[in-house]
Amino acid sequence: MNINISDAIKYIGVDDKDIDLFESQYIVPNGISYNSYVILDEKICVLDTVDKRKTDEWVANLENVLDGKTPDYLIINHLEPDHASNIQLLADKYPDMKLVGNAKTFNMLPQFFDIDLTDRTVTVKEGDSLNLGKHTLSFYMAPMVHWPEVMVTYESKEKVLFSADGFGKFGALDTDEDWACEARRYYFNICGKYGVQVQALLKKAAKLDIEKICPLHGPVLTENLSYYINLYDIWSKYEPEVDGIFIAYCSIHGNTEKAALKLYDILKEKTDKKIAISDLSRSDMAENVEDAFKYSTLVVAAPSYDGGVFPVMNDFLHHLKIKGYKNRKVAMIENGSWAPCAIKSMQPYFDEMKGIEISDAKVTIRSTMTAENEVQLAALADSII
């Protein structure tokens, strides 16, 4: 696929609609794109490569744009294999081409490739520039967004930010869907742990005059950039995007599910806030993580199991912990037929998170929901709305 970002800047990335799991863990029903770009000037540069799954298609796109010319530079914004797998191929194909990266790039690169880097590298630091002729590139370090060597590249003539994995999303480019949903799921599951680092990058970007954002996944952003930047600001500050409630439950024989659904109905009667609900056992974990971050309040409902909490809830809370979940209101419901212990197992996760306000209105169900439990659920609802 060749797309004109401008007369001089070309998109040469590829869609991957055959992949079942991105990073061997995230379902991508609409596939994913691996984005790569070329700037045609007195000096020609390629910005990042693509995953090895799509090498042949990418090489064809590249050769079509180059039209017999030779690239002078390969900009390595990110070394992760879905963007860097073809560095070796390109270095071998064009032996006079220079590799442009930062010190961490070239420290890590030999771990992936056997390339003689002698006289082949251009090592850049924060704010360094590379002149291509009419176009000038400037480089800004973005460590841990979401790898240590990541940098972004800014082209000043056409005011384009090549943002690495920042502003990326799941989904092939020809997918007709709202950007925010799959960008949010991508952000919190890929970059969510690194909000402080994303904030640092946003502050650098705020000093640049940006008219287009070219990420390594998802569409090129060309209009209403403040919308996308504002969402990234909210997400990376760990602030709720929506003043609402997300009920995450799991249930072995359906009794905890009945309690969760009852709470959902009670909340619908009591408040106009947005209410979302999900069965953790039968839904995408990455989407559940996304929704936990999206809403201001989280309710977890789970049965006791093997002296702890049902495994899928344990997995869910572990995901939230490692992604830096914070600054939310939380309420808990447990079920147990003889020794309820789910809350005791869930509580330590929240105790380790920052800015978590836990409702005192905890609910314990003994096998099946009673009239008293329904009163308790109403009290829980009152405590979180």
Where are these regions (language model features)?
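FMN-binding flavodoxin-like domain, especially the glycine-rich phosphate-binding loop
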Residues: 173-213, 217-220, 262-278, 288-385
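Conserved beta-strand hairpin/beta-sheet module of binuclear metal-dependent hydrolase folds
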Residues: 2-63, 152-155, 159-163, 256
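Metallo-beta-lactamase
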Residues: 4-7, 101-150, 194-200
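Active-site neighborhood of phospho(di)ester-bond hydrolases with catalytic His/Asp-centered motifs
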Residues: 47-49, 71-79, 99-102, 161-165, ...
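Short acidic active-site motifs
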Residues: 86, 284-288
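Metal-dependent phosphodiesterase/nuclease catalytic metal-binding core
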Residues: 38, 152-214, 222-249
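Short, charged N-terminal beta->alpha structural module
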Residues: 248-269
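Active-site metal-binding motif and surrounding structural segment of the metallo-beta-lactamase
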Residues: 42, 53-100
